[in-house]
Amino acid sequence: MSAAIWVVVPAAGRGARFGAPMPKQYLQAGGQILLAHTLDALLAHPAVAGAMVVIGPDDADWPGWSEWAGKPVLTCIGGATRAASVLAGLQALPETVRADEFVLVHDAARPNLSPADLGRLLEVGRADPVGAILAAPVRDTLKRAGDDGGIDGTEPRERLWRALTPQLFRRHQLSRALSEAATAGVEVTDEAMAMERQGQRPLLVEGSEDNFKVTTPADLDRFEFVLSRRAG
């Protein structure tokens, strides 16, 4: 079997768009916080060795876990942006994680990752020299808006995908890509964007639409419905 993989989970965001009194990754669903569901999904896979959870400097809600599902859970302090937090997590990984080893990055508030999706990503991504991301083809019709709010045109969607997580890259390549983007003053919105700036072409691995990010109260309601259906 290939070397075990660590996952970096950026959880330093405050979730301001959600409007809750605490970061959304700490909201309850089905008897435990969202972050617990996320760790369940990640650490259940036999290839995942442990998790580096990146938290905010004033995070009073972090439960203080040191292990989950019998695997180590480490923490470090993140930065002002997602990219800065991911970079901090990569730098804080144990020394046993070599520079050329693949590392996963997964959103803390994306708790409904399926074992099948994670397995496909690992299988495809580790066979590629660059890596891969989970993504979903765009199925809705896309409109381009003008400054006045009117429609300026309809965009072709045939080759458009929505980026999901996890995303899988080699530790040193992703660290360099994120660092160079920060030096250039470029705000990257996911890890693949940083790699693209390096001239790399990560693979797209189709993932389930159920692997959604909890961003609004409606998303939380949707996840609770999923949990209720799963419980029977």
UniProtKB/Swiss-Prot annotation:
It is an enzyme of class 2 (transferase). The keyword Nucleotidyltransferase applies. Keywords: Isoprene biosynthesis, Nucleotidyltransferase, Transferase. The record marks R17, K24 as: Transition state stabilizer. It catalyses: 2-C-methyl-D-erythritol 4-phosphate + CTP + H(+) = 4-CDP-2-C-methyl-D-erythritol + diphosphate. Its EC number is 2.7.7.60. Gene3D superfamilies: Spore Coat Polysaccharide Biosynthesis Protein SpsA, Chain A. It comes from the Bacteria. Belongs to the IspD/TarI cytidylyltransferase family. IspD subfamily. Catalyzes the formation of 4-diphosphocytidyl-2-C-methyl-D-erythritol from CTP and 2-C-methyl-D-erythritol 4-phosphate (MEP). This is 2-C-methyl-D-erythritol 4-phosphate cytidylyltransferase. The gene is ispD.
